[in-house]
Amino acid sequence: MSVDELAREQAILDAAAELLCRIGYNKLTMGDVAEAVALHRGLVYLQFKSKDELVEATVRRELGRYARAWRAHLLADPHAGSVASVYRAMVHTLSRLPLAAAIVARDPDILGKYPAKPGNVFERLANTGTRDFLRAMQAAGTLRPEVDVRTTAYILDALTPAIRRTLPIGDAAPADPERPSADQLLETLADLLERALTPDGADLARGKTLLLDELAHAHAEFDATPNRQEGTLS
């Protein structure tokens, strides 16, 4: 792919990301994207043969950014290696990446009917989630051995949309004054997770190393974009 083609692809992905956040998957059209980047619709189809292929590429790129930012925060956190450190990094990162926050929370306003479509990108990224992080930490001894990883992952994933609702993202309405801020929620959640899941004397350095390895694996999955064929307007 030439430099011009790479630049065009990134411009298309930038436009798709902005439009997903603004109007959502259900209303998004390839024509909208073409108009946003001032290209003929046919040139957009030369890069991505369908709307779903474009959305997949946009999701993969955003999750790659999410993984890189998450990794940077873990590297800078002297207490990284516990479950709580994962959530400290998650909240810090999602508050800065609104599309990633919508993707992680499977926000129906943004993703619409896409996650229910057969062959969607989330089906192929099913193994790069919370359960993998918990298994890595249990193997490192930074998660209590008696913890049921599958159930804990399910509970923590269910909390993600609630966490996201506390984040000041985009043009969202002011938060309910009775609702805790992201910092307050994170402080309480981190304390609960540390008390319930982290064993005494845990080797956080080892946990941090394994977490970074898991993130590297996830990043590779996000970057493994399927080969695309030249699209048509039909």
Locate predicted features:
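Short amphipathic alpha-helical elements of helix-turn-helix/winged-helix folds
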Residues: A15-L19, T93, L159
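C-terminal peripheral helix-coil segments that are non-catalytic and often amphipathic
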Residues: T128-A140, R165, I169-S234
